[in-house]
From Swiss-Prot:
Compartment(s) where it occurs, according to its Swiss-Prot or TrEMBL record: Secreted
Pfam families, per the entry: Lipocalin
Protein name: Epididymal-specific lipocalin-6
InterPro entries assigned to the protein according to its UniProt record, in alphabetical order: Calycin, Lipocalin, Lipocalin_CS, Lipocln_cytosolic_FA-bd_dom
Keywords, in A-Z order: Fertilization, Secreted, Signal
Function as written in the Swiss-Prot or TrEMBL entry: May play a role in male fertility.
Keyword Secreted in annotation: yes
Entry-linked PANTHER family: EPIDIDYMAL-SPECIFIC LIPOCALIN-6 (PTHR11430:SF10), LIPOCALIN (PTHR11430)
Gene: LCN6
GO biological process terms, semicolon-separated: acrosome reaction; calcium ion homeostasis; cell maturation; cellular homeostasis; response to calcium ion
Intrachain disulfide bonds: none
Sections of the chain in a coiled coil: none
Tissues/organs with expression: Predominantly expressed in epididymis.
Length: 163
């Protein structure tokens, strides 16, 4: 199927915003289509225990008639396949999306080469507890050395455990 999209930088002080800004202006069409989610990292409490029970398959990114991003994601786990649809509204800054009504505070594209990978940071909020992830999206079933290196760099600099 495909991989997910973008990432957020709200309460993280350890990574300067300037590192994510070099991407320039966003053309949402550069993110459209199927993506494999090849790696996920987080420092959320339950992540280390749950990571062996989940296998993220991918995401398909499309545009809505309102020009927002829509993601159809598929995740395999012990209970079978779960699918979800999420609409993300573009903020004024080029690579930031949100949908606070469903708990997505920010989604940022941290890095991409516009050809085969994107590193996505997501800040979610469930109740009053924030939950952050970094994900490696790839247009192919295996990631390039460049993509893996950037994913590892971002994950480690944020102190995340990877899956």
């Amino acid at each position: 199927m495909g991989g997910l999209l973008l990432a957020a930088f709200l309460a993280l002080v350890s990574v300067p915003r300037a590192q994510a800004v070099w991407l320039g202006r966003l053309d949402p069409e550069q993110l459209l289509g199927p993506w494999y989610v090849l790696a996920v990292a987080s420092r959320e409490k339950g992540f280390a225990m749950e990571k062996d029970m989940k296998n993220v398959v991918g995401v398909v990114v499309t545009l809505t008639p309102e020009n927002n991003l829509r993601t159809l994601s598929s995740q395999h786990g012990l209970g079978g396949c779960d699918q979800s649809v999420m609409d993300l509204i573009k903020r004024n800054s080029g690579w930031v999306f949100e949908n606070p009504s469903i708990g997505v505070l920010e989604l940022w594209v941290l890095a991409t080469n516009f050809r085969d990978y994107a590193i996505i940071f997501t800040q979610l909020e469930f109740g009053d507890e924030p939950f952050n992830t970094v994900e490696l999206y790839s247009l192919t079933e295996t990631a390039s050395q460049e993509a893996m290196g950037l994913f590892t760099k971002w994950s480690r600099s944020l102190g995340f455990l990877s899956q």
